[in-house]
């Protein structure tokens, strides 16, 4: 699902303009509107697809997934996670499942590459089945020339075996998305 110009799926609620915009939507008589919160849906789907026990456990326990990731990566108690550590973990959580590189993560977080590398390594140490799932997805794409969705749709990736690292990297990121 998507919408644009305007994006009616993401109308602001925390400011006055957003509150006024929302008043314009009125259900027909006998009907009601409902709201669905897809909180961290990408991470929840990745936890399911990969079967990663640590991430599944964090969701089942109702933990703040970004704080839980920070706690595990930085090897501290969840209650000791700082705002900055949580923010970095959040960037890593979403960036990594979309195939961000050490360089890309360092740029996005404005940190040295070594710190970004340590964060990615810590992430995969924490969630090893996610790494395994991503690697196997790329492996299957290389062997077949496509990746298949859970509904059987094939996404062809003609550049997955390219000799050009940049072109191949783009196809590999598409294989895990």
Regions found by a protein language model. Give the residues of each.
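Acidic, glycine-rich two-metal-ion catalytic cores of nucleic acid-processing enzymes
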Residues: 1-80, 142-177
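Conserved catalytic core of nucleic-acid polymerases
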Residues: 71-177
